[in-house]
């Protein structure tokens, strides 16, 4: 992008970003982009292919026996995210006895509903297991 302003203008209407709360979107523009010293303008701080490679090379040992967590855990998943549709929370609950909660919004729900997510996390931390 030629500037942070242009990036914001082009990214805001896209599905991934369009529901970000205003301050969260601005923080994304301020901190997820960096100046591009070679071409000018700005680019993502973490290149898209680096993110793809993280998920591509992240091995899943799900099928192996695993020890249940020794600390209290509570999973929060997005109502419209990919994990609920694939029944991942139900699998985690069955395998590890980890409760889960479905929260409104998409995959990036903490940036869509930051105040509500903070309140939920505080409530979960203060509630005895």
Residue positions per predicted region:
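Short alpha-helical functional segments enriched in proximate histidine and acidic residues
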Residues: 10, 108, 124
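C-terminal alpha-helix
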Residues: 120-128
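Catalytic histidine-centered segment of alpha/beta-hydrolase-like enzymes
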Residues: 105-118
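Helix-rich cap/lid subdomain of alpha/beta-hydrolase
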Residues: 1-39
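Conserved serine/cysteine hydrolase catalytic core
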Residues: 22-23, 30-95, 101
């Amino acid at each position: 992008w030629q500037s942070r302003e242009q990036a914001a203008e082009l990214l805001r209407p896209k599905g991934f970003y369009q529901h970000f709360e205003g301050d969260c979107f601005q923080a994304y523009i301020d901190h997820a982009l960096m100046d591009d010293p070679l071409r000018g303008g700005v680019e993502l701080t973490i290149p898209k292919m680096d993110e793809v490679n993280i998920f591509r090379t992240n091995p899943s040992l799900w099928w192996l026996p695993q020890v249940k967590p020794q600390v209290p855990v509570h999973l929060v998943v997005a109502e419209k995210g990919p994990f609920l549709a694939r029944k991942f929370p139900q699998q985690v609950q069955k395998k590890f006895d980890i409760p889960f909660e479905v929260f409104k919004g998409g995959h990036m729900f903490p940036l869509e509903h930051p105040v509500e997510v903070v309140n939920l996390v505080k409530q979960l931390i203060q509630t005895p297991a």
